[in-house]
Structure formats: C-alpha cells, structure tokens
C-alpha cells in the first residue's frame, strides 16, 4: 500500500519507577547492552525562534556534545552512566534553547524514540536548586505508566546530584493525603491538579512545567482542562515546555496559547515515520478470521517482546481470555484495571516475564520497552466515531518499536473496505509505503519477518529492507 495507490476492494467485508530505567535509557544517542553503537536516521528539525535575538550561528545553538551545554559534572556523569554519547538530533536543537537564561517556553516535535524525555529531563535537572527542599518542577503525562517511566529516567539521570528528591503524583488511594515535597514531581494531570488544590504540593517555587505527549492531553477536553487548571495554580513566570511526536493543526493553536512566545521545533508529516520500523499489512477475509491469523504470529511475537493494539477494552479482555485458554502466555492492560494492577502488568512486560502485551490506546504513547520488536494493530486506529482514520495514534502505536535506531515491525490487520481505506488514508497522510504480506506461504512470512527483526541495525537502506519484504 503506497500513498498514491488507488483504493481496492479487499477479499470480503469496538472505541475507544525506577524499574523502568534500564528500558527507557535508549532515549538518547547511546549504546545498547552489547556495546555496539546505535544509529539515528537523518531528519530535519525546523526551528522557529520566539526570541529574534537568539543567534542560530552561536555554536551552542546546535550542540554537538553534552559537554558543550555547560551541564554540571554531576549531570554529565549521569548522562554518561546512561550510555549517552552525544545529543540526538532533537536534543542537539532543543537543549541549547531550553537551557537559555532567562528561560523561554518551547513546543517541540520529534519522532518517537529520538530523545525527547532526556531533553526535557536535562533541562529540569539543570534548573533545580538543591539547597531548597521544595517542588521546583512538574512533568505531566497522560498515563500512570508513562509518568512512572519519566520519573525513572529523571531519577536515574540525576542520581549523582546529592540530595535530589523525585516523586510520582499518580492515583494511589493509600497516598491521597501524602505531602509531595520532592524537587521534581511527575504525574498525571488529574492527580496533580487535586494535590495542588488541596495544597499538598507547595507551588511557590515551581519554575518548570513540562507536558509530555502534550497534543494528546491538550486535545482531550477533560485532560486539557486539568492541564490548564494545573498551570493556573502555578506561578505566572514558569517555563512551559510541550513535547510530542505529533502536533495536529487542531491542537497547535491551543498549544501556542498554553505556552506563549515559544521556540517551536517541528517536523513535516512525511518525516514523522521512522526508518527503522518496517510497516506491513495483512488483508484478512473477514473480521472473524483476525484471531486465527493473530495466533499464527505468536511464535514471532515471543522471540522478543510484542504489543497488540486493539480499539476497545472488551476486545483486549476477550483476546486475553481466548489466548490464555489456549495455553498462550499474554498480559492485558487497559484503563479498566486498577492502578496497582496496571503497574504490575507493565512491570511484568518490562522484565520480560510477559512477552506479549494486549492493550488499548492507553499505552500508545511514550512507553519505551527496549525489547519490543513487533507491534500489531489488531484494529486500525480510528477517531472516536470509529470510521475516520487516526494517523497520529497510528504513529504513536508503531513508535513503541524501532526505538532509537533499532529495527521493528509494525503489522496492521485489514479485513474489509472500511479498514483498508482507513489504512490507505494513514499511508497517504504520512506519504509512506506500507507493504502487503503474501499469506500463501506462512513459512515464508515467518522467515521474512525474522530477517527484519534480526537486522543488527536500522541503518539498512529502505531498498534493502523492502527487498526482504518483497523477495
């Protein structure tokens, strides 16, 4: 399926802590466990400066090394400890602007898995005054899982900053009355808003507010309102930083109001998809055959780790029930689970105890598990109406694999004219090619996907990877 390919009829004719660090530290230019260097596909980050006095010719405007950023030795030690060797493209552009004094706001967009978390974490940690034992920075995320992951990265990166305190602000009935007095707080908008209103968070000294997956939070009426209320409860002169892989037009105007006079870093649509992710689709006769087709991929899914994305909680629960009943080991996570159960499931997945995770869009954004080599879109991502394609969610889903130079496979199931058209619309939006899988020989399908997964580097040319798929 290509962006220009005409619509065809398919064969025949539900809505949607620290333990994370070892997995999340691929969020920069580093080295994997085996010591071989990673590569980052070239892409262009467009920079729009709010402050016209900022000098693009200044050598610090584009930092080629972390040392150039004049970070403290404690922070540099933390960066090296996480195996970061040099800034990624987004870090190279964003960090000099984030670290300027006086601080300026930022709206930054970059591909999934390219170092956004490390960028805003370094900015947060660079501005913390350890002599003051009170909250100075808040980072918000749309899910507890992502909040815990970000907290782990910040804690690990700042491990050599003596006296640094970090805390999570996520739903927990046992800690509802706990005072949050750490230097850095990472949480979900609803919990942070409640704790601020109840004065369990002292806001006087907070100077940085970060929204990760900002477009997702600002675009949701409830969560967007919560983010706005959080900001209204903070000092007026705080630095506001918005990060995401996507900023659709409907959100960008609101983002500009939420973070006024921002430096803006953006990508074109066609630069958002990641070279190391091989995007495939499989045309299935009918919806009822999707489950049996999914089972054919179970062996491949368990060679490393895989995520199966579905549209509804009901589908997630049903897939888990059927697969477990047939002897397959899988885990399931959706918003229907209690917080502690969600923590248990994601920790099992990170540790490799569970290699296959069935989930809804609750985990489509930001979650970084290094071992994920395959993402399956059991349901094509759509808008709330279930009819219109959702390109941004597709991008975030497949971005759970192919993290920072690694290779991954994204496989989407289509089963009727509507789902085929939705996927075609997604391909057109990103101006990218999606390759069909020939299911006449399942042994050949398995061999082809194994070749892709076992590729040592995402730096293989598109031509080489396409030949693997089509040969």
Curated annotation (Swiss-Prot):
Alphabetical list of InterPro entries matching this protein: DEAD/DEAH_box_helicase_dom, Helicase_ATP-bd, Helicase_C-like, P-loop_NTPase, RNA-helicase_DEAD-box_CS, RNA_helicase_DEAD_Q_motif
The enzyme's first-digit EC class, named in words, is hydrolase
> What is the protein's quaternary organization?
Associates with the nuclear pore complex.
The record's Gene Ontology cellular component field reads: cellular bud tip; cytoplasmic stress granule; nuclear membrane; nuclear pore cytoplasmic filaments; nucleus
Q: Where is the Helicase C-terminal domain?
A: 276-453
Reaction catalysed by this chain?
A: ATP + H2O = ADP + phosphate + H(+)
Residue span of region Disordered: 1-39
Motif span (Q motif)? 64-92
Topological relation to the membrane, as annotated: Peripheral membrane protein
Membership in a protein family:
Belongs to the DEAD box helicase family. DDX19/DBP5 subfamily.
- What does the UniProt record say this protein does? ATP-dependent RNA helicase associated with the nuclear pore complex and essential for mRNA export from the nucleus. May participate in a terminal step of mRNA export through the removal of proteins that accompany mRNA through the nucleopore complex. May also be involved in early transcription.
Single GO term (MF): mRNA binding
Which Pfam families does the protein's record reference? DEAD, Helicase_C
Specify the protein name: ATP-dependent RNA helicase DBP5
Gene Ontology BP annotations:
poly(A)+ mRNA export from nucleus; protein transport; translational termination; tRNA export from nucleus
EC number(s) of the enzyme? 3.6.4.13
Q: Which residues form the Helicase ATP-binding domain?
A: 97-265
Q: Where is this motif: DEAD box?
A: 212-215
What are the binding positions for ATP in this chain? Answer: 110-117
The organism's taxonomic lineage, starting at the top: Eukaryota, Fungi, Dikarya, Ascomycota, Pezizomycotina
Q: Where in the cell is it found?
A: Cytoplasm; Nucleus, Nuclear pore complex; Nucleus membrane
The protein's organism comes out as Phaeosphaeria nodorum (strain SN15 / ATCC MYA-4574 / FGSC 10173)
């Amino acid at each position: 399926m290509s962006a220009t390919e005409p619509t065809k009829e398919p064969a025949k004719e539900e809505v949607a802590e620290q333990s994370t660090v070892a997995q999340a530290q691929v969020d920069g230019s580093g080295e994997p466990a085996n010591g071989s260097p990673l590569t980052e596909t070239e892409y262009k980050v467009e920079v729009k400066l709010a402050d016209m006095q900022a000098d693009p010719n200044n050598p610090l405007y584009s930092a080629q090394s972390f040392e150039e950023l004049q970070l403290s030795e404690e922070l540099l030690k933390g960066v090296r400890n996480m195996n970061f060797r040099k800034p990624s493209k987004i870090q190279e552009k964003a960090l000099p602007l984030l670290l300027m004094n006086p601080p300026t706001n930022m709206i930054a967009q970059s591909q999934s898995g390219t170092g956004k978390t490390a960028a805003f974490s370094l900015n947060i940690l660079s501005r913390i005054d350890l002599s003051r034992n009170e909250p100075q920075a808040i980072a918000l995320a749309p899910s507890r899982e992502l909040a815990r992951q970000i907290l782990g990265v910040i804690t690990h990166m700042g491990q050599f900053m003596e006296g640094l305190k970090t805390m999570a602000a996520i739903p927990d009935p046992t800690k509802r009355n706990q005072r949050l007095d750490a230097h850095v707080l990472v949480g979900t908008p609803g919990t942070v808003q409640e704790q601020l209103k109840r004065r369990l968070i002292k806001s006087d000294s907070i100077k940085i507010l970060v929204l990760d997956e900002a477009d997702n939070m600002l675009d949701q009426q409830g969560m967007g309102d919560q983010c706005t209320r959080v900001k209204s409860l903070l000092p007026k002169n705080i630095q506001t930083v918005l990060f995401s892989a996507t900023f659709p037009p409907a959100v960008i105007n609101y983002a500009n109001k939420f973070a006024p006079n921002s430096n803006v870093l953006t990508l074109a649509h066609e630069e958002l998809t990641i070279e190391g992710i091989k995007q495939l689709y499989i045309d299935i006769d009918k919806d009822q055959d999707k489950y049996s087709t999914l089972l054919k991929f179970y062996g491949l899914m368990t060679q490393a780790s895989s995520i199966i994305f579905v549209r509804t909680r009901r589908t997630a629960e049903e897939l888990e029930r059927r697969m477990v009943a047939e002897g397959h080991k899988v885990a399931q996570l959706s918003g229907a689970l209690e917080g502690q159960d969600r923590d248990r499931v994601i920790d099992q997945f990170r540790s490799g105890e569970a290699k296959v995770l069935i989930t809804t869009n609750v985990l489509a954004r930001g979650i970084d598990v290094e071992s994920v080599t395959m993402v399956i879109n059991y349901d094509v991502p759509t808008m709330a109406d279930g009819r219109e394609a959702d390109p941004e969610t597709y991008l975030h889903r497949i971005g759970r694999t192919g993290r920072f130079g690694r290779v991954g496979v994204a496989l989407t199931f289509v089963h009727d004219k509507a789902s085929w058209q939705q996927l075609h619309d997604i391909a057109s939006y990103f101006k990218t090619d999606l390759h069909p899988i020939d299911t006449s020989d399942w042994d050949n399908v398995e061999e082809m996907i194994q070749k892709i997964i076992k590729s040592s580097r995402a730096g293989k040319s598109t031509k080489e990877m396409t030949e693997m798929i089509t040969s």
